[in-house]
Design a protein with these regions (language model features):
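A glycine-rich dinucleotide-binding beta-alpha-beta segment and adjacent secondary-structure elements
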Residues: 151-164, 318-319, 377-436
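A conserved FAD-binding loop/helix module that cradles the flavin
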Residues: 44, 432-454
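Helical element adjacent to the flavin cofactor pocket in flavoenzyme catalytic cores
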Residues: 174-231
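Mid-domain catalytic core of redox enzymes
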Residues: 218-332
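General small-molecule cofactor/ligand-binding pocket signal
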Residues: 72-75, 210-212, 428
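N-terminal glycine-rich phosphate/pyrophosphate-binding loop and immediately adjacent elements
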Residues: 1-113
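C-terminal segments that line or cap access tunnels to active or ligand-binding sites in enzymes
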Residues: 282-391
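Rossmann-like flavin
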Residues: 86-171
């Protein structure tokens, strides 16, 4: 998606752009796939940074302006309401920051002044600065907040939605998440990520971007300090003045003709995820009375955000119910949907023989469904199972197969390159490893890097 946004931005100013996509569906990590008659979103639990129409100076309004997209074209529908659940406590995330402040005051009365001071401090940071604000957010929270449970409850959603670091998140990324999750909020187009991709593809066609699908890059040819050509999977050589790569920083290095295929091993991300998707008969699903949009949960005393030693860590994760957005009168999804995400071990999943791999997908589908239902209004197993219409699971192995991201690391390398620069003067990193994450972040990444490296000369 960062590549689509960069292509649109560059082509708007008359630059000739070739957009190469390894797969047959656009969007990369923020895409969709079809199975049967259903289209499954990949990545999009919510489009973050939602603000009411008319709000100015926000990431959402910036990207709409820079891509010349009208807000109504996105068809954004705000969430009904989300929760952080841990240690028997709950905090609301419902697109109203004041409600979160009130919950902190009620649940952690001794910490409310500290929380307000923390908000003031984070709000003073320029979270989108391309220099970035290094350092540990966990250390920052240890310094600013005395209650360990409150610290963990704030790390829980920000890590799951934006950190490539184990057991921490960089301060600049934490500031981005603070704004996008807590101070602004969640929304979703009625048809999901396809709406965003459709708009970007329309803009690509409008500005004559040359798009080639199922056309991966085999090698980046390097001479001296420049990338001079691309060798495509079919052997075609393409020459270019500048290259913007959303393949990942390490993955991009390993494509270079002057680098070893094993370069930068220590910079590969370790955090993989498993996600289960279940669909339900709509009438039955409505009777479940599951009202939350997203639930960030942790069932342990302390929040551990690290690659598990076993296949999956079911003790913390994210529950998403895409039905629970305010779609407007007369509009509802055709089926009920339940998505559950948890940390998973890439290497352990890749070691499994095919038959055991399929068995374990079914096993963890059932286990995570049970975990999620422990955080939702109870329903009998027979009622639940009778309403079920389909299931699917993707693992770190799935992510690596279809995206090429090493270790199936959705958030990429823990080493981000905020200015997008590499040691080559005309090769730039966009997307996850530039440092802006999620759907909104991906588009802003493409826009920012196109502006900085392609339009300022």
């Amino acid at each position: 998606m960062s590549g689509l946004a960069a292509a649109v931005r560059l082509s708007m100013f008359g630059q000739k752009v070739l957009l190469l996509e390894k797969h047959n569906a656009a969007g990369g990590l923020n895409s969709f796939y079809a199975r049967g008659n259903r289209k499954y979103d990949v990545g999009l639990h919510a489009l973050t940074n939602w603000v009411p129409e008319g709000a100015k100076g926000t990431p959402l309004t910036k990207l709409l302006r820079q891509l010349r997209i009208k807000r109504e074209e996105l068809d954004l529908c705000p969430q009904l309401g989300s929760l952080i659940k841990m240690g028997g406590k709950e905090l609301r995330l419902n697109n109203q920051f004041q409600d979160l402040v009130e919950d902190v005051a009620a649940v952690f009365p001794r910490s409310i002044d500290q929380f307000k001071a923390l908000d003031h401090y984070i709000s003073s940071l320029d979270e989108t600065s391309l220099e970035g604000q290094g350092g540990s957010a966990r250390a920052l929270l240890d310094e600013k907040l005395s209650d360990p449970l409150l610290r963990d409850m704030l790390l829980l959603p920000t890590c799951f939605y934006g950190s490539a670091l184990e057991n921490d998140i960089e301060v600049s990324q934490f500031a981005i998440m603070w704004r996008s999750l807590f101070k602004e909020g969640f929304a979703r187009p009625f048809i999901g990520v396809r709406q965003v991709i459709r708009l970007l593809l329309d803009r690509c066609r409008e500005h004559q971007v040359d798009r080639r699908m199922k056309c991966g890059v085999k090698q980046i040819v390097v001479r001296n300090t420049r990338a001079v050509a691309l060798i495509l999977d079919d052997g075609t050589e393409v020459t270019t003045d500048k290259i913007y790569s959303s393949a990942g920083a390490v993955e991009t290095q390993r494509l270079r003709s002057d680098c070893s295929p094993q370069v930068a091993q220590s910079e590969i991300g370790r955090l993989g995820y498993l996600e289960t998707i279940s669909t339900y008969k709509p009438d039955d699903f409505s009777k479940f009375s599951w009202r939350e949009t997203i639930i960030f949960f942790c069932d342990e005393e302390r929040f551990n955000y690290q690659s598990p030693k076993s296949l999956v860590d079911p003790k913390s994760g994210v529950i998403c119910i895409p039905n629970n957005y305010s779609y407007g009168s007369g509009r509802s999804l055709d089926e009920g949907w339940l998505r559950v995400t948890a940390l998973a071990n890439h290497d352990e999943w890749c070691r499994l023989p095919e038959s055991e791999y399929l068995d374990q997908k079914t096993n963890w589908l059932n286990q995570l469904n049970r975990v999620a239902r422990n955080h939702l209004k109870p329903i009998a197993d027979a009622v639940h199972d009778g309403a079920l219409t389909s299931t699917d699971v993707f693992t770190p192995r799935t992510v690596r197969k279809y995206t090429g991201h090493l270790n199936g690391a959705i958030y990429g390398s823990p080493v981000k390159r905020r200015d997008g620069r590499t040691d080559l003067e005309n090769l730039f990193i966009i997307g996850t490893d530039q440092g802006f994450l999620g759907v909104t972040g991906a588009m802003l990444s493409g826009i920012s890097m196109a502006n900085l490296h392609g339009l300022k000369e």
